[in-house]
């Protein structure tokens, strides 16, 4: 997550750089983002709840002089708040260009969706059925107990809170689109069957993604 702030420095502060999280998928060619970027802006990104989101950014590296070592140092010395960093509020001098949600669509596909972001970790389609390998934050024992009781007595409950395995994505279009991307990548030899078997054996992907 933090490595996104290394990109301008890594590219010697040159060119425009598209930075995306690994759980973002291109459903269409994202090159139009160049046209939607204002050359007077430091970066372009999507806003949610009036906050700029840093998981997908087009950064003008010639204008954005982030020093990764300094950022990390300030973060661990509590000089920068983590949420402020993620929401790009750590630098109030940034000139941010707001672009459409089609470039960072959270778990839904619309006609204009270009970049699909699978934000809910427990329903990421390539993990379906595997044991959860992350810690669920901000959950009390009472919350978990309450959901288990609801399940036992057969009433509606929050599966995400108590599931020990990754769940099926609730949006069939999202699930099918990502499955098709995996199959297309295999067909185009970006990886082979041996690679797939290795990642399945290491519990990095579920075999269900190729069904």
Where are these regions (language model features)?
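GT-A fold catalytic core of metal-dependent nucleotide-sugar glycosyltransferases
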Residues: 3-49, 57-64
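Short, solvent-exposed loop/turn segments at the edges of secondary structure
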Residues: 51-52, 111
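Short edge beta-strand segments in beta-sheet-rich domains
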Residues: 52-54, 94
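Small-molecule pocket liners
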Residues: 54-56, 114
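Detector for methionine-enriched segments
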Residues: 56-57, 86
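A glycosyltransferase accessory/donor-loop signature
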Residues: 65-211
């Amino acid at each position: 997550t933090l490595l996104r702030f290394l990109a301008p420095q890594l590219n010697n502060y040159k060119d425009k750089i598209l930075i995306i999280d690994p759980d973002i998928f291109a459903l269409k060619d994202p090159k139009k983002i160049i046209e939607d970027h204002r050359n007077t802006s430091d970066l372009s990104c999507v806003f949610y709840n009036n906050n700029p989101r840093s998981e997908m950014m087009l950064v003008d590296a010639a204008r954005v002089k982030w020093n990764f070592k300094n950022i990390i140092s300030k973060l661990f010395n509590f000089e920068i708040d983590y949420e402020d960093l993620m929401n790009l509020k750590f630098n109030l001098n940034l000139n941010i260009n707001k672009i459409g949600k089609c470039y960072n669509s959270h778990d839904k596909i619309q006609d204009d969706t270009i970049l699909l972001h699978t934000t809910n970790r427990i329903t990421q389609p390539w993990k379906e059925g595997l044991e959860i390998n992350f810690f669920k934050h901000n959950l009390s024992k009472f919350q978990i107990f309450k959901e288990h009781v609801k399940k036992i007595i057969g009433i509606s409950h929050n599966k995400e809170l108590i599931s020990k395995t990754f769940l099926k994505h609730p949006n069939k279009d999202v699930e099918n689109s990502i499955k098709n991307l995996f199959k297309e990548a295999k067909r185009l030899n970006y990886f082979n069957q041996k690679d797939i078997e290795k990642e399945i054996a290491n519990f990095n992907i579920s075999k269900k993604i190729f069904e």
